[in-house]
Design a protein with these regions (language model features):
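Generic secondary-structure signature for well-ordered alpha-helical cores
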Residues: 17-25, 50-53, 111-118, 141-149, ...
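Catalytic alpha/beta core domains of metabolic enzymes, predominantly
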Residues: 162-305
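A mid-to-C-terminal "edge-of-domain" accessory segment
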Residues: 249-390
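Alpha/beta enzyme core
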Residues: 2-27, 47-51, 66-191, 211, ...
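N-terminal active-site wall of soluble small-molecule enzyme domains
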Residues: 32, 36-61, 65-71
Length: 390
């Protein structure tokens, strides 16, 4: 929504295939969500379903009407999201209803969804501004009654629509992430496996709030590739992959190397510029410009690299050449650019290193402020080697 140029049908299919590879056979990326209101979206949904993947399961987000329920059921979708906004801002000012009218309307929608043979996923929009005990708990409790009576599981997606959730202990509801997840379980009787967290990053708390929701019992968190989403974005799927690995000590079948392939595809094939410092995905996430850091990387990569980015993400650590790179930065750049290992490695004593250092120093002593590109380095190396037989 309002976040980037929409993907084409072919791009959606390709990204779905990459998500399948990224999540692995254990289905760590459990579900995906499609709109069904344009031919392009419906074509993508149908073609992705034809692939026959178990994971990610294809679900939809639809308007709450019997016609739409029948539409997604006819396609073969088994679960759909329905919007059930729960704050007074939405109930009173957006929909012009009372709380009772909203509750009755929502119960009718959920009943229609079940009657159509679908599993409802109720999106509790704006939950971090809702009356938790006055509306959220009674509504969620009623949904659990319907679930028991019908035998159909009903999920609740707790949506922090404006990113107002707070992860710290002792915070009052409705802004307490832990309080929301705890309250849904213990006051409304919602099982952990029926609770999802949907966060936004307006206050830079997207990832930490999602992790907090996990820790307090939400079985799933909603993510988007690279965190792309409305306004400031949502929770990046690549961030939660490493959060999961940090918490559990295992990737559990995920293949994080596909993060790199996804990032390059989004940047090169969909023309979406990824900020270079984006963790795990940006061009410069494991790049250093400081000579002292390059010196440490040469002695032991673990000193200044967050983990073995080469084996996990197919992204070896890099250095760029600036006025602070020193001979250490130049040596590191040479060895990695030309795959020098062992006895063939350049050292600070090599004549080529000395000449390059002299040239780099001269560049910045004469007013240069931009880093030296790889192409410039290669051109200068060719010039030096030709002139001095280095």
């Amino acid at each position: 929504q309002q976040s980037r140029t929409p993907y084409t049908t072919e791009q959606m299919i390709h990204l779905y295939k990459l998500l399948h590879k990224l999540g692995g056979d254990n289905g760590m990326i459990r579900q995906t969500e499609f709109f069904v209101y344009s031919k392009k979206d419906r074509d993508a949904l149908e073609k992705c379903m034809e692939l026959g993947y178990r994971f990610p399961e294809i679900t939809t987000w639809i308007r709450a009407s019997k016609k739409d329920f029948e539409l997604v059921r006819s396609i073969g979708v088994k679960e759909t999201g329905v919007l059930v906004s729960c704050s007074d801002y939405h109930i009173f000012h957006k929909m012009g209803l009372t709380r009772k009218e909203a509750l009755d309307k929502y119960i009718g929608i959920v009943s229609d969804c079940i009657e159509a043979g679908l599993r409802p996923r109720c999106h509790f929009e704006d939950i971090t501004r809702a009356d938790f005990y006055g509306f959220v708990v009674p509504f969620a409790s009623r949904l659990m009654e319907i679930s028991r009576e019908s035998g159909v599981p009903i999920k609740i997606r707790a949506c922090d629509t404006l990113g107002l959730g707070v992860p710290y202990p002792g915070v009052a509801l409705p802004r307490s992430v832990s309080g929301i997840i705890y309250g849904l379980q213990h006051y409304a009787g919602v099982p952990s496996d029926m609770i999802e967290w949907h966060g936004h990053n307006d206050f830079y708390k997207g990832v930490v709030n999602a992790t907090t929701a996990w820790m307090y019992g939400a079985s799933a968190v909603n993510c988007s590739l690279l965190g792309i989403g409305e306004r400031t974005g949502n929770v990046p799927v690549e961030a939660m992959i490493f959060e999961y690995a940090s918490l559990r000590g295992t990737m559990n079948g995920m293949h994080p190397e596909y993060i790199t392939e996804i990032a390059r595809y989004i940047e090169n094939d969909t023309n979406y510029p990824i900020p270079p410092m984006t963790p795990f995905a940006g061009q410069n996430f494991n790049l250093t410009r400081a000579g002292i850091h390059a010196d440490g990387l040469m002695k032991n990569p673990e000193i200044y690299n967050i983990f073995d980015t080469e084996s996990i993400l197919n992204r070896p650590p890099k250095v760029s050449i600036t006025g602070t790179s020193g001979t250490a930065g130049i040596v590191f750049w040479l060895n990695h650019s030309y795959s020098r290992r062992g006895e063939k490695e350049y050292t600070k004593k090599d004549p080529l290193v000395a000449k390059l250092y002299e040239w780099v120093t001269d560049q910045f002593d004469n007013g240069r402020i931009t880093m030296i590109s790889d192409a410039e380095m290669e051109e200068q190396i060719a010039t030096l080697c030709e002139a001095q037989d280095l």
